[in-house]
């Protein structure tokens, strides 16, 4: 939730950051969080910066907007009664990591909130049907510092050079059509923070490149669905998948309301 983007969807992008652009009536960030929650991961740290106040306000009102309530203003009560809620049982920490901070610097700034445990990390503008539990199992099996999910997509992005599952280098797209790209959905060991310097550090160009050079970056090849949202065409495509009930990443069911 940290990328300053062009006006993706006209006026909508001018008032909110890309992760808060809605698909199917909810921010794409919410869809990503629902994916992780499906596999039991319900504690989130959001690296906010540009339009960070919008993200905080959205979560501040999340409980209210997902609950049936009565507002009683009679006799000067000014009372709010909550009857039932469809609230997700999450813990969400939103950190202002700065307006101009680069990706690596943003991750560095949340170090004290992460602690000394391995953690999951992804970008706030792409959805995927990768099986998170299998991704974690794979990461544990090789013992390296970092694992990223790699997909083969026709995207205008840098591609990965991989040997035996190990990411060796990053290259420009025109050098290798059909080569896998970094889709996010990473598992990172706390040692990753040693590769991050200051606010000018670009995670992909500095940390991941150094990890690849040292043989500490592995790839998890995903052959299923992945799609980022870089433009209006991709937003409309994701909207259509949700409207037709064909969104591969939407594994969760509607929650049963909790009566209070």
Identify the residue ranges that each predicted region occupies.
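N-terminal glycine-rich phosphate-binding loop and ensuing alpha1 helix
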Residues: 11-12, 16-64, 94
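Conserved beta-loop-beta/alpha segment of the NTase-like Rossmann-fold superfamily
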Residues: 54-164
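Well-ordered alpha-helical segments embedded in enzymatic catalytic cores
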Residues: 28-32, 105-109, 207
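Short, small-residue-biased leader/transition segments that mark boundaries at the very start
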Residues: 1-15
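Catalytic-core segments of class I nucleotidyltransferases/pyrophosphorylases
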Residues: 118-120, 127, 131-140, 153-155, ...
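Residues at the starts of beta-strands that form the adenosine-phosphate
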Residues: 42-44, 145-146, 216
């Amino acid at each position: 939730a940290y990328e300053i983007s062009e006006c993706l969807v006209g006026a909508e992008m001018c008032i909110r950051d890309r992760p808060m652009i809605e698909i199917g009536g909810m921010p794409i960030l919410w869809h990503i969080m629902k994916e992780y929650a499906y596999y039991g991961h319900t504690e989130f740290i959001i690296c906010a910066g540009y339009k960070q106040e919008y993200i905080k306000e959205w979560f501040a009102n999340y409980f209210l907007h997902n609950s049936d309530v009565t507002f009683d203003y009679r006799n000067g009560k000014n009372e709010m009664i909550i009857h039932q809620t469809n609230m997700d049982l999450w813990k969400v920490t939103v950190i202002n990591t700065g307006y101009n901070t680069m990706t690596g610097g943003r991750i560095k700034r949340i170090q004290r909130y992460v602690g000394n445990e391995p953690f999951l990390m992804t970008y706030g503008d792409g959805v995927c049907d990768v099986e998170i539990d299998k991704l974690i199992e794979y990461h544990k099996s090789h013992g390296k510092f970092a694992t990223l999910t790699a997909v083969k997509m026709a995207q205008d992005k840098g591609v990965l050079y991989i040997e035996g599952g190990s990411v060796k280098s990053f290259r420009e797209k025109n050098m290798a059509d059909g080569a896998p790209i970094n889709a996010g959905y990473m598992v990172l060991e706390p040692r990753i923070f040693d590769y991050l310097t200051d606010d000018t550090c670009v995670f992909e160009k500095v940390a991941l490149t150094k990890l690849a050079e040292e043989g500490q970056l592995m790839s998890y090849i995903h052959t299923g669905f992945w799609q980022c949202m870089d433009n209006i065409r991709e937003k409309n495509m994701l909207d259509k998948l949700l409207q037709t009930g064909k969104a591969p990443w939407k594994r969760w069911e509607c929650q049963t309301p909790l009566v209070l």
